[in-house]
Amino acid sequence: MSIAAVAMVLNEADIIETSIRHLFAEGIDEMYLAVGECDDNSWNIIESLDLPIHMYHDTDEVWHQAAWTNELIARAGTDGHEWIVPFDADEFVYATNSDSIADTLADCPHDNLLLHQWGHHSWGAREVTPRTQPKVAFRYSFGVTVSMGAHACSLPGGQWDVLDIREWQFLSFDHFCKKVRTRIATLDPVERARGNGWHMTRFDGKSDEEMRTEWEAIQAIPTIADPIPSRLPPGLGLVGQA
């Protein structure tokens, strides 16, 4: 049994090493990443890691997330991986039973997993209520595809409470502004017309002052003390570590 993680990456230098190392600590075997035209050093950070990562350069100005993710899934499946775990750079997948992802999937009888997505305001502060849309992880079969954002896949059914995700989407107010505006500028117009990316496009055209109000509203969402579950050893100097 082998597991591949797949993701698109754009301007995630602040957190990408942490999320990558987290998944490998969970027993992921290989990773397939489409890295966009970053204006930070995301590419160099990933390239410098001594880990089994396949990197592909996404030179398109438009964020074709579903198409790229499905291409990465197909490549991972062709390479023989049984399980596929899509993720975003700001997401941390974990097993709800406290075992590693690898140990959990080795004994999993299900083919399509639905993951609760819990928002974080810091490494240790989790929102009380999960996001409305799930994420997916699944056993590979030829032709399987996911929707934009990997909120659904083409396999039937779906089992909750095997894996979940913690998402630390915005690290600071400045990070919030830059990330939102970059995502809006690169969003596929076709996907936007379908209503996808609404969690970003709802901020379109807002001034810095208006964005500050939105940031404060996000920070006011109730949280509890519940750190991101991770097998990362302390002292690596990664995001969230003292």
Language-model segments: residues:
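The conserved acidic donor/metal-binding loop of glycosyltransferases
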Residues: 88-93
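A structural signal for isolated positions on well-ordered beta-strands in alpha/beta enzyme cores
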Residues: 4-6, 30-32, 54
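Active-site-proximal specificity loops/subdomain of glycosyltransferases
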Residues: 41-86
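Short beta-strand/loop segment that forms part of the nucleotide-sugar
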Residues: 29-37, 57-58
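A generic secondary-structure signal
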Residues: 22, 71-75, 104
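Catalytic-site signature of metal-activated, phosphate-bearing donor transferases
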Residues: 66-70, 95-242
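Short acidic/polar active-site loop segments enriched in Thr and Asp
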Residues: 29, 82, 111
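N-proximal low-complexity "stem/linker" segments adjacent to membrane-targeting elements
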Residues: 1-24
